[in-house]
Amino acid sequence: MVVPTLLAALLTLAPVGEAAVPAIAATAVIDLVVLGGIWLAMRPGAPDVRSAAELDRFRHAGRPVLVELYSNFCLICMATRQVLKAAATDLGANCQIVRVELPTAGGREIAGAYRILYTPSFLVFDAHGDLVRTIIPDTITPLANGYRVLDETGAFVSRLHRISEEDLVRLVRRAA
């Protein structure tokens, strides 16, 4: 959006030269404001869990828990937000969905405990609080390489090309 607008301004403004500089600068500022607004609207927002102790309270509440480990600067995390909302609607009160921001102190503590390196990653706990599934990006570029689903021992179970509402709901229902 920014580049085409700037390019259009550069190509269509007359006169060219010093007189065009204010118009180009104004266009650049408008583009940055619009882009910033879009980014703010898509950000995943505040985490539900800020420490391992908080996560433990959710884990031992007597129902399955789906944990998303995300980053506010991760574009895939932003896209996954709608998938999580749809999964939450499908699962209703049968499951708790919580989010952990990875680049925080609590997020790093939780990520270290479960060997999470990249976002978005997901942990599925059963109603007893036991980890039953981990969904992690295969590499830092999950759009290209997909995700690995691991069991409670860390053994490979299956591969997902992308995170879908159906996959999340199925994994959580299996944990119930």
What are these language model-derived features?
Residues 1-48:
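N-terminal targeting signals for export/organelle localization
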Residues 47-56:
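Alpha-helical transmembrane signal-anchor/signal-peptide segments
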Residues 60-73:
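Short active-site neighborhood of thiol/selenol oxidoreductases, capturing the structured segment around
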Residues 69, 92-108:
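Thiol-based oxidoreductase modules, predominantly thioredoxin-like and allied folds used
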Residues 74-77, 122:
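The canonical Cys-X-X-Cys-His
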Residues 78-91:
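Typically the conserved alpha-helix immediately C-terminal to a functionally engaged Cys/Sec
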Residues 113-117:
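A short glycine-leucine-enriched loop at secondary-structure breakpoints
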Residues 118, 123-176:
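Non-catalytic, surface beta->alpha helical segment in thiol-disulfide oxidoreductase systems
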